[in-house]
UniProtKB/Swiss-Prot annotation:
PANTHER family, A to Z: DNA PRIMASE SMALL SUBUNIT (PTHR10536)
Subunit and partners: Heterodimer of a small subunit (PriS) and a large subunit (PriL).
Names of the cofactor(s): Mg(2+); Mn(2+)
Any one of the GO BP annotations: DNA replication, synthesis of primer
InterPro entries: DNA_primase_S, DNA_primase_ssu_euk/arc, DNA_primase_ssu_PriS
Name of protein: DNA primase small subunit PriS
UniProt GO molecular function: DNA-directed RNA polymerase activity; metal ion binding
CDD domains: AE_Prim_S
Enzyme Commission number(s) of this protein: 2.7.7.-
Originating species: Saccharolobus islandicus (strain Y.G.57.14 / Yellowstone #1) (Sulfolobus islandicus)
Family: Belongs to the eukaryotic-type primase small subunit family.
Functional summary from the UniProt entry: Catalytic subunit of DNA primase, an RNA polymerase that catalyzes the synthesis of short RNA molecules used as primers for DNA polymerase during DNA replication. The small subunit contains the primase catalytic core and has DNA synthesis activity on its own. Binding to the large subunit stabilizes and modulates the activity, increasing the rate of DNA synthesis while decreasing the length of the DNA fragments, and conferring RNA synthesis capability. The DNA polymerase activity may enable DNA primase to also catalyze primer extension after primer synthesis. May also play a role in DNA repair.
Keywords assigned: DNA replication, DNA-directed RNA polymerase, Magnesium, Manganese, Metal-binding, Nucleotidyltransferase, Primosome, Transcription, Transferase, Zinc
């Protein structure tokens, strides 16, 4: 089977955008970064590079810019005595933060299209027989779906603050949802998988009874149930995992080119071009003809017809498989 290699961040131009970003990016690193495992997926590979350890932001930056430019960049929720050890037992787990993952595509039904990047035809299989290449998939992420994910994050924050007395931070994942993180120390950090599962099930509303006739303003689940909140839609496996990798705040998501960004005020969050660090314009060559919503804008593309468009949009379209960024225009 032929392999089509110019999509998903493989072009040198996209790499240059990412490298220039990481030259000056102020990554959101934990104060105890020397206790964390770092990992990344480099450009041009499906494999992750793991078991990395850094003691300063400068050391990390030098590695990213000069040795392994990341398409995706992570650190561990766990703290380890030896984070660079390749054997998980040798790392010596010291506790971990508490994580929650909200994927908007688990909440909404999104439009999905699979197509051949050569002929542009819609194809349901993973291969185009005519051109002997692998097909690509595009999933449209809408602002309405992101809003629904944000509402789930809002409900989760309320539960963690009011019912557990925790101080969660909310991050836009950089692509299709939100991460909610509690920096844990002491007993919180030492919660095992079973205890974290209980917390996950609690916020999902598993086993929580109905309270008919209760007041909407009542505290806890009584008020939530009577406001129509039956639970928060999270990926429970993320919460249970005590050795999970976290996307580094202010890193770039390799499937969108958007920043993994802390949301300090949920009321002010907007799914738009401001989430991209890229300025200027690009020349974008579409693989297919399509009208689609992109970062809260309606975009019309015609197959094979180059379009001059903001770099934030062009890079997003490229990483979403809809075509190629061919040039940068200042």
């Amino acid at each position: 089977m032929g392999t089509f290699t110019l999509h998903q961040g493989q072009s040198n131009l996209i790499k240059s955008f990412f490298r220039n970003y990481y030259l000056n990016a102020e990554l959101g690193l934990p104060n105890d970064m020397e206790l964390r495992e770092f990992a990344l997926q480099p450009f041009g590979s499906d494999m992750y590079i793991r078991h990395l350890s850094f003691s300063s932001s400068e050391e990390l930056r030098d590695y990213l810019v000069n040795r392994n430019l990341p398409l995706h960049l992570f650190y561990s929720s766990a703290r380890y005595q030896l984070p660079s050890a390749r054997d998980m037992e040798e790392k010596a787990w010291m506790g971990s933060d508490l994580l929650f993952d909200i994927d908007a595509d688990h909440i909404c039904k999104l439009r999905s299209i699979r197509f051949c990047p050569v002929c542009g035809n819609a194809i349901t299989s993973e291969k185009c027989e005519r051109d002997n290449v692998e097909t690509l998939e595009y999933v449209e992420m809408t602002s309405e779906c992101i809003k629904r994910g944000l509402e789930e994050a809002r409900n989760l924050v309320e539960i963690l603050e009011d019912d557990f007395g925790l101080k969660p931070k909310v991050y836009f994942s950089g692509n299709r949802g939100f991460h909610v993180q509690v920096d844990c120390y002491g007993d919180c950090a030492l919660l095992d998988s079973d205890e974290r599962k209980e917390i996950a099930e609690y916020v999902m509303g598993v086993g929580v009874p109905s309270y008919p006739g209760g007041s909407e303003s009542a505290p806890g689940w009584v008020g939530r149930k009577n406001r129509g909140i039956n639970g928060v839609t999270i990926d429970g496996q993320v919460t249970i995992d005590v050795k999970r990798l976290i996307r580094i705040p202010n890193s770039l998501h390799g499937k969108s080119g958007l920043i993994v960004k802390e949301v300090t005020n949920l009321d002010d969050f907007e799914f738009n071009e401001a989430l991209s660090p890229f300025t200027g314009y690009t020349i974008f060559l579409p693989y297919i003809s399509i009208e689609t919503e992109v970062l809260s804008r309606n975009i019309k593309l015609n197959r094979g017809v180059p379009i001059k468009i903001e770099s934030s949009i062009g890079i997003y379209l490229h990483l979403k498989n809809l075509g190629e960024v061919k040039a940068y225009v200042r």
